[in-house]
């Protein structure tokens, strides 16, 4: 769901996991070229991903995503381009509604075909994005740089080096009430402007991936990464609230340093004549966070950093050994099974201690066994069916532990990890040049972590007892001829509380807020290698509950987009001129909801009809 709020990053939900996140990614794990884009505590973001360098994206849903460890209700693997011969330079410029610009450059190439010792491939890109924003007080700018370098060390080993850096400055327009949205979806609440709600993010990260074939049947893989992330956020919390005893102020200043290593060994063999592959490994991640809070005012001047109200150092680490196996039981029947033992430790040291704000230091440690298994049967060469089951584990993030409800001071150490059990039945069928998929699933969760309340940009969390998700997914990706492609997907997801999450009132049987019951997409594209191309897509989302009581809902919507362009191939040059219209019929709809917003400002409106045009020019040195 697109919040249209660059201060809070993109929200992604997989089978309802991630829907509670008020900023960034939550409940799912994301990897870019094998390096986590999810912090060790489970909080992720997409701001450091260069969309112009993406080669493909794979999404893993269902029980086996749990084998990736903590916060893996789903897994998204992003693979960026690998440089190839010939060397290519590319420049692109894009302009859209609301004063939006994106300019980028990219260079890629290789010194060989990657099979000989000393062969090198590279992809380097940089981009700048600026926008005034659809709503008032929603301007943003982002500078992004990425580099990927691959080296063939010898006949049996390769090394990939990765680097990225991002700087984001964004105003935060916050949410609106239903009346405000209907009167003027572009407006903001008065406090947002008074306190100049905004966020600044600086992140730098580097990683390496070493792969070696130890023998005909053995492979070694080592992934290492390290990074730092600095975040400063000014919230629109009223002055009187910030002055309460124990309240941590209206400015959040975070400094995070994180690193990790994942080492795995893969062995292929036969056991009792059954071909089997074993993969064993150890994953270690750690993060140190310095969290400070300040008043968002200085005297009568609002929207500036004032007196300190919080100062703590948080340390978390996780250590996860794991084993995965793949058994080819017969020509048609295969079994995948694995287990992971996840240990997550959290420790907080409070350095801001006063008579009215006592020492809130504390620690927590969580352990869980995470088994998963899947049985796959090949009905024929183009059709298979499978059944799978597994257990998932999701600990609170540092942010979720940082705030308690009802203006209480200190850490939310009563927040417990959520555990889930998932079963799934599905099938995949190749139809000509297309793929038809179907899946039914059920996920039962205990101690699900959900939003308790949200106030002026600050959210506290609670455990919701038991929840259940039942769903059906259908998908079709069909190629017609050489240039036509049709994609369609539909998800029916019934996500409900099974025990009380509303305090004195009963929420048993209520829908979990933030999750749509029906989601559908269809897209048709005509895309030859050169000349004219065009496409259209339709998205539907049913209504979404915005609070635990289900008293408030964001209405359903259907939006249509169209795009077209022309691509020239002239000797070594490629020119691509393109344009797009989103929300073609100018629907007034809600792009995202802020769950349990205490002031009734649940709604984050989406833009009306908007336009974009662009040009990409590349030159290949042949």
Describe the predicted segments one by one.
Residues 35-61:
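Short acidic/polar hinge/loop motifs at secondary-structure boundaries
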Residues 158-164, 200-353, 378, 429, ...:
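Face-selective signature of the C-terminal outer-membrane beta-barrel domain
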Residues 164, 323-325, 387, 423, ...:
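Conserved C-terminal beta-signal and adjacent last beta-strands/turns
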């Amino acid at each position: 769901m697109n919040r249209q709020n660059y201060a809070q990053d993109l929200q992604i939900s997989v089978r309802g996991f991630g829907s509670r996140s008020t900023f960034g990614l939550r409940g799912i794990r994301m990897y870019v070229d094998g390096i986590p884009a999810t912090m060790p505590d489970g909080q992720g973001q997409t701001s450091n991903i260069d969309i112009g360098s993406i080669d493909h994206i794979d999404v893993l849903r269902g029980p086996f995503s749990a084998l990736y460890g903590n916060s893996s209700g789903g897994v998204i693997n992003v693979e960026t381009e690998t440089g190839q011969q010939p060397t290519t330079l590319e420049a692109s410029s894009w302009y859209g509604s609301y004063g939006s610009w994106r300019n980028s450059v990219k260079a890629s190439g290789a010194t060989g075909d990657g099979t000989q010792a000393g062969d090198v491939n590279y992809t380097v890109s940089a981009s700048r994005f600026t926008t005034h924003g659809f709503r008032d007080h929603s301007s943003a700018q982002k500078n992004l740089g990425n580099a990927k370098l691959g080296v063939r060390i010898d006949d049996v080993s390769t090394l990939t080096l990765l680097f990225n850096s991002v700087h984001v400055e964004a105003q935060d327009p916050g949410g609106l009430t239903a009346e405000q949205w209907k009167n003027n979806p572009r407006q903001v609440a008065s406090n947002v402007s008074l306190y100049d709600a905004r966020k600044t993010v600086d992140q730098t990260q580097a990683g390496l991936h070493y792969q070696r074939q130890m023998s005909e049947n053995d492979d070694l893989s080592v992934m290492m990464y390290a990074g730092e992330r600095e975040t400063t956020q000014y919230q629109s919390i009223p002055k009187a609230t910030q002055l309460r005893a124990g309240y941590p102020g209206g400015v959040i200043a975070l400094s995070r340093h994180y690193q990790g290593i994942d080492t795995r060994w893969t062995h292929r063999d036969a056991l009792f004549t059954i071909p089997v592959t074993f993969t064993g490994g150890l994953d270690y991640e750690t993060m140190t966070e310095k969290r400070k809070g300040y008043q968002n005012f200085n005297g009568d001047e609002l929207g500036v950093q004032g007196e300190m109200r919080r100062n703590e150092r948080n340390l978390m680490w996780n250590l996860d050994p794991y084993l995965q196996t793949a058994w080819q039981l017969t020509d048609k029947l295969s079994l995948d099974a694995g287990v992971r033992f996840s240990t997550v430790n959290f420790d907080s040291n409070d350095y801001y201690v006063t008579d009215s704000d006592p020492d809130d230091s504390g620690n927590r440690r969580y352990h869980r066994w995470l088994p998963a298994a899947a049985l796959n049967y090949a009905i024929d060469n183009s059709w298979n069916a499978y059944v799978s089951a597994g257990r998932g584990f999701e600990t609170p993030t540092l942010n979720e532990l940082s705030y308690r409800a009802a203006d209480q001071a200190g850490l939310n150490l009563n927040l417990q990890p959520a555990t889930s059990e998932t079963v799934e039945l599905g099938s995949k069928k190749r139809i000509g040049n297309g793929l038809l998929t179907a899946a039914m699933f059920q996920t039962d969760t205990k101690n699900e972590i959900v939003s308790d309340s949200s106030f002026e940009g600050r959210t506290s969390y609670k455990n919701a007892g038991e929840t259940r998700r039942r769903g059906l997914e259908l998908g079709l990706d069909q190629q017609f001829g050489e240039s036509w492609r049709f994609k369609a997907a539909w998800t029916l997801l019934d996500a409900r509380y099974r025990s009380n999450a509303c305090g004195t009132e009963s929420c048993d049987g209520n829908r979990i807020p933030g999750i749509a019951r029906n989601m559908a997409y269809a897209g048709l594209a005509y895309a030859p290698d050169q000349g004219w191309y065009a496409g259209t897509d339709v998205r539907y989302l049913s209504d979404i509950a915005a609070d635990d009581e289900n008293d408030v809902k964001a209405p359903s919507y259907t939006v249509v987009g169209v795009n077209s362009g022309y691509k020239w191939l002239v000797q070594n040059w490629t020119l691509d001129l393109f344009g797009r219209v989103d929300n073609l019929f100018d629907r007034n709809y809600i792009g995202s909801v802020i769950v349990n917003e205490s002031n009734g400002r649940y709604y984050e409106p989406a833009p009306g009809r908007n336009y974009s045009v662009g040009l990409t020019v590349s030159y290949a040195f042949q």
